[in-house]
Amino acid sequence: MFAMLSALLSSQLLTDEKSLDSIEGIDQDLLLLITRMFSTITGAFSTIISILFIFILSLIVTKIFKTEPRVKSLFSGSISLVLIINIVTLIVVIIQFLFGLNPEKYNILSLNIFNPGNEILGAFDFKLIIQSYLFMLLLHATGKLSIKYAAIISIVLFIFLLTLNLIGALI
């Protein structure tokens, strides 16, 4: 739900009504509604995919290290991790919505705030740090891994996610 709300607010800020004039035969209001609905549905699906990715990743890591966590606990922890990240995202989107900051130009959770529009700085996102830390807690508390191994895996996850963000910024 939080992902859907943040996607809806983001689409509210990102949708440029002038760019929607270019499609003939479709009413502008209908096109705007379709765009917002598509953004909301995409936000919901991305949340489900994130939960499954974190769950499968934590399950694989715990199987590699031969710990015996409860699968329900890992799934619950994965849901909690994604929920916390989505709440942070929703709060940031609400703040940006209230102050009229364009999410394409500014991201107040990244280094992009110092140089608006710079996508490479936008790749260095505070949510990555939060997500990696929460993944470490998930592996340690629920996955029954030692804090040392959980921290190492969390750092590897952080580097992987940062690399994906940088590749996405460069493309």
Model-derived features: positions:
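Hydrophobic core of alpha-helical transmembrane segments in multi-pass integral membrane proteins
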Residues: 1-7, 155-164
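Hydrophobic alpha-helical transmembrane segments and adjacent short intramembrane/lumenal linkers
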Residues: 80, 84-156, 164-165, 169
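Membrane-helix interface segments in multi-pass membrane proteins
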Residues: 6-42, 96-124, 167-171
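Selected alpha-helical membrane-embedding segments in polytopic membrane proteins
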Residues: 1-89
